[in-house]
From Swiss-Prot:
Pfam families, A to Z: UBA_8
The gene coding this protein: UBALD2
Family the entry assigns: Belongs to the UBALD family.
Compositionally skewed regions (Low complexity) per UniProt: 146-164
Annotated stretches, region: Disordered: 128-164
Species, as recorded: Homo sapiens (Human)
Keywords: Acetylation
Record's protein name: UBA-like domain-containing protein 2
Disulfide bond annotation, renumbered to this chain: none
Length: 164
């Protein structure tokens, strides 16, 4: 292959510049050449020139960039919009059924966690330490209900104790 690596790299940079800036390829090539193929410098130059109305007078005037993290575009407009925004405004000003439905549960709503626990279930008591957990003298729950505690469960408990 006789493709020059510099030409290939320059073509890739031009294509990336066109995608990033949205300009024509010939303008991207001119800006990159003027910036000695420094991508960020050329991109910065492109956006600074597009923000200045009379770019041939840009050496006489100092303009702050208008779209940086410190100064978003149309900053005064954004401040004005935020100043009009109130968190409680929507709830107080509108009494529509949709607002009421969004803020309160339906009339037939009965959350399971608000009801009292079933009487057959013993309250859970957290162990004071991991070593004293097996020393609590409470009957082990059986499954299925009514089944007798058999040797299989005792073997399982012994196997669990052996793993510790």
């Amino acid at each position: 292959m006789s493709v020059n690596m510099d030409e290939l790299r320059h073509q890739v940079m031009i294509n990336q510049f066109v995608l990033a800036a949205g300009c024509a390829a010939d303008q991207a090539k001119q800006l990159l050449q003027a910036a000695h193929w420094q991508f960020e410098t050329a991109l910065s130059t492109f956006f600074q020139e597009t923000n200045i109305p009379n770019s041939h007078h840009h050496h006489q005037m100092m303009c702050t960039p208008s779209n940086t993290p410190a100064t978003p575009p149309n900053f005064p407009d954004a401040l004005a919009m935020f100043s009009k925004l109130r968190a409680s405004e929507g709830l107080q000003s509108s009494n529509s059924p949709m607002t009421a439905a969004a803020c309160s549960p339906p009339a037939n709503f009965s959350p399971f966690w608000a009801s009292s626990p079933p009487s057959h279930q013993a309250p859970w008591i957290p162990p004071s330490s991991p070593t004293t957990f097996h020393h609590l003298h409470r009957p082990q729950p059986t499954w299925p209900p009514g089944a007798q505690q058999g040797g299989a469960q005792q073997k399982a408990m012994a196997a669990m104790d052996g793993q510790r």
